[in-house]
Amino acid sequence: MRRVAIEFSYDGTDFFGYQIQNNVRTVQGELEKALEKVFKIHIDTYAAGRTDTGVHANGQVVSFDCPNDRLMENDIKNAINANLPGDIYIKKVWFTHPTFNPRYEAKRRIYHYYIDTSKSKNLFTRRYVWWFPYELDIEKMRIAAKYLIGEHDFISFSKKGEENTKTIRTINNLRIIEIKNGLILIRVEGISFLRGMVRSIVANLVRVGTGIWEPEKVKEVLESKDRSKSAGLAPAHGLFLYKVLF
């Protein structure tokens, strides 16, 4: 039996998040059903991160123990893909060491969040971007973003329920990139994140971009350690787990 790692993407629109739950469709549930079809036994999987309902992934990573030692990487990839629904796709398969667990061995996780500020709604991208048809001051957003880089207590930028967990996190890089035609990318890099943290960061930066807040307000929210001071959460469908680095 060999430990296998897979990198895969999924459209999170029609899933109730990544983590397996009873009576609802989840990414982990569909993946483990496909593995059971291929290998004829139940196989537990270990993921680099658990995305919320509606959140997508370009580079999620999962490990599991493969009961068939004769299959090569490409055989495993093709067999799993043949049994997955159309909104999940295995991109890469590789053999790794026997205890590899992407959740604990990830050195960095990169999230992308897309905002469409164009005046007309694009029906063909609406599942993957936050349509926000208002002008944003990108330079002010970049100033505000600098307050969040480094190690901080991010409880103000988390969902309820994180109070009893360690809320110190480190953001290694936070970039705001103007792509084209009103499309904006917010790229956030860190080792790990609190639940809702990236979406909260985006919502607070957008509040600055609209001119309602000055950039320094984000620093105040951070230092307050009070979730009620935050601008809330940006919509889930604009967020992608882009890449996990080891």
Curated annotation (Swiss-Prot):
Species whose genome carries this gene: Fervidobacterium nodosum (strain ATCC 35602 / DSM 5306 / Rt17-B1)
GO BP terms in the entry: tRNA pseudouridine synthesis
Listed name of the protein: tRNA pseudouridine synthase A
Function according to Swiss-Prot or TrEMBL: Formation of pseudouridine at positions 38, 39 and 40 in the anticodon stem and loop of transfer RNAs.
Enzyme Commission number(s) from the entry: 5.4.99.12
Self-association state and partner proteins as the record states: Homodimer.
Alphabetically ordered keywords of this record: Isomerase, tRNA processing
Top class in the EC scheme: isomerase
Domain of life of the source: Bacteria
Originating gene: truA
Family: Belongs to the tRNA pseudouridine synthase TruA family.
Reactions performed catalytically: uridine(38/39/40) in tRNA = pseudouridine(38/39/40) in tRNA
Cystine pairings recorded for this chain: none
InterPro entries: PsdUridine_synth_cat_dom_sf (IPR020103), PsdUridine_synth_TruA (IPR001406), PsdUridine_synth_TruA_a/b_dom (IPR020097), PsdUridine_synth_TruA_C (IPR020095), TruA/RsuA/RluB/E/F_N (IPR020094)
Active site: 52
UniProt-annotated binding residues for substrate: 111
Keyword Isomerase: yes
GO molecular function: RNA binding; tRNA pseudouridine(38-40) synthase activity
